[in-house]
């Protein structure tokens, strides 16, 4: 039986659902982006829904120290500072998706790349002359660990913001945050938050 553990994190841009297998981060996304996985029935798994700071104490089932790591990462990220330590995570997907997500992680905090640029890199990795930007976009849509595996850093060829599961307003806010131009930050303190829900 597979165990799945869930916690929520309230960010300035909405509630984030975090999933772990008890050892590493397995999913992280804005709650309304893909539906509430914790509310789904898992016949082959044990589901424990943990909420708020109660989920982050060391006394919880299995310790679940991964939730502490993720909360620390998210706190730093949403304060407008690049997190120093990335929580341990495990990605599950097709071989193609895994290559796309691996290359995606190489895009630095505060930087962006286009779907076409990412497709070129993936094509080289796969020993192909070309790769469809649309195929890369489909793999990005399946990314289970948003923010940590930064699909929001991929933009359209003309610099336009397109295709983010969390919504384009949220994508714009995340990029502004990383580039130090978020009007809702005062240094590393949050002032007021744009309405992105």
Functional labels for PLM-detected ranges:
Residues 1-27, 34:
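DNA-contacting interfaces and partner/effector-binding or oligomerization modules
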Residues 11-15, 62-63, 153:
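Conformational gate/switch positions in structured elements
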């Amino acid at each position: 039986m597979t165990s799945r553990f869930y916690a929520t994190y309230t960010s300035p841009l909405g509630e984030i659902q975090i999933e772990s297998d008890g050892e590493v981060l397995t999913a992280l996304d804005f709650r309304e982006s893909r539906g509430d996985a914790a509310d789904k029935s898992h016949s082959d798994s044990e589901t424990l829904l943990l909420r708020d700071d109660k989920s982050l104490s060391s006394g919880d089932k299995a310790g679940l120290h991964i939730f502490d790591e993720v909360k620390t990462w998210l706190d730093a990220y949403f304060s407008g500072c690049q997190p120093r330590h990335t929580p341990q995570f495990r990605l599950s997907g097709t071989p193609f998706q895994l290559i796309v997500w691996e290359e995606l992680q190489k895009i630095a905090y505060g930087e962006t790349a286009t779907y076409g640029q990412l497709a070129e890199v993936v094509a080289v990795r796969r020993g192909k002359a070309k790769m469809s930007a649309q195929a890369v976009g489909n793999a990005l849509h399946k990314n289970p660990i948003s923010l940590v595996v930064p699909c929001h850093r991929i933009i359209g060829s003309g610099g336009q913001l397109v295709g983010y599961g969390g919504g384009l307003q949220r994508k714009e806010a995340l990029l502004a945050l990383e580039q130090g131009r978020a009007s809702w930050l005062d240094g590393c303190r949050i002032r007021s938050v744009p309405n992105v829900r």
